[in-house]
A protein has these predicted regions:
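Extended alpha-helical targeting/anchoring segments
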Residues: 4-336
Length: 336
């Protein structure tokens, strides 16, 4: 086990110190050995070889717009303040190799090159491979310090410097996006308040701006001090699933999502991360994530619906969020 700059070997008490030291030496040697990067299979210019994949949503554009209108009706009735609605972009791999397409790792390298993010993840689960380019931290625990960084508010990057600056400024000044962000900040303050010391929950950053290859995001930071009798699992139980990808209030928002979305989300909007023996934890929100399974792959995209949401704008925002992944694939998007 490697923790920051330390290497620890564990074993049964009956084991000897000599055996433990031998394991440490073996692991240290492996860590110091240069690793050759995986070679990209021939013919992998596109996923599965051949023509670029063509993605198509699991719902018609008009049906998604209607779902947004239904969500707004629930908001107007006072059921919720915000609902995060999504749809799934799906494509077929023309010539899949063994193990979910066989080209997942080169694709992940390409995805990271096109869209560098702080919380990427590659999970080969055998029948399913998950390639995540998430920009969003869900929960981090270091000692007693807890941090969550919800993203709410998105604009596409501009094609020129002037257009890009206009997008950036427009997001920063958008009352709608700031209201969306603030709702989720309040929700997460409440979630952290269940497990943190009284009076320790703070918002050191409100409405910060982060730029990525294809989008601008409005990001806030909420922190707290975990109560000493609690641990990482207690923190996860109090906060999962993330408020930024469900809505507010969380449980009613999830009930509406269950009604309006035709498919279960799977790994999308869950969390990927690690928990260490020291109690440290870091997790991401599973967004901007491609899932490969057999001869199929899919990318789920969504956005927050509030009282003054425009259905057309909400739909366009979902596509902007998926653009980095689609660009990495050289993919085409077929709307219907």
């Amino acid at each position: 086990m490697c923790i920051r700059d330390r290497l620890i070997a564990t074993g049964l008490p009956a084991g000897t110190e000599t055996a433990a030291r031998a394991r440490l030496a073996e692991i240290e040697a492996r860590l110091e050995t240069p690793v050759e990067p995986p070679k990209e299979p021939e013919g992998s210019e596109e996923v599965g070889g051949g023509s670029p994949p063509r993605f198509r949503s699991n719902v018609r554009r008009g049906d998604y717009l209607e779902a947004v209108r239904h969500a707004k009706e629930y908001i107007a009735a006072g059921d919720v303040y915000q609902v995060n609605l999504s749809h799934r972009l799906e494509a077929k791999v023309e010539h899949p190799s063994d193990g979910c397409g066989g080209r997942a790792w080169p694709l992940y390298e390409r995805l990271r090159a096109v869209s560098p993010v702080p919380h990427g993840a590659y999970l080969d689960l055998g029948d399913v491979v998950v390639l995540s380019a998430s920009p969003e931290r869900f929960l981090r625990l270091d000692g007693e310090r807890v941090e969550t960084r919800p993203i709410k508010g998105t604009r596409p990057r501009g094609k020129t410097p002037d257009e890009d600056e206009a997008m950036r400024t427009g997001l920063l000044c958008s009352e709608k996006d700031r209201a969306e962000n603030l709702m989720i900040v309040d929700l997460l303050r409440n979630d952290l308040g269940k497990v943190c010391r009284v009076g320790s929950v703070r918002v050191p950053e409100l409405f910060g701006l982060e730029g990525y290859s294809s989008v601008w995001h409005l990001v806030s930071t909420v922190t707290g001090e975990l109560r000493p009798e609690l641990g990482a699992v207690d923190l996860l139980k109090a906060c999962f699933p993330g408020g930024s990808v469900t809505g507010c209030p969380k449980i009613r928002a999830m009930e509406i999502i269950e009604e309006l979305e035709p498919l279960r989300r799977g790994v999308y909007c869950g969390a990927i991360g690690y928990l260490s023996f020291t109690g440290t934890m870091d997790t991401s929100i599973v967004i901007r994530t491609l899932v490969l399974s057999g001869d199929r792959m899919h990318l789920q995209v969504g956005g927050a619906v509030v009282a003054d949401s425009d259905p057309e704008s909400e739909y366009a925002e979902t596509l902007a969020k998926g653009r980095a992944v689609l660009n990495a694939l050289g993919a085409e998007l077929e709307e219907w």
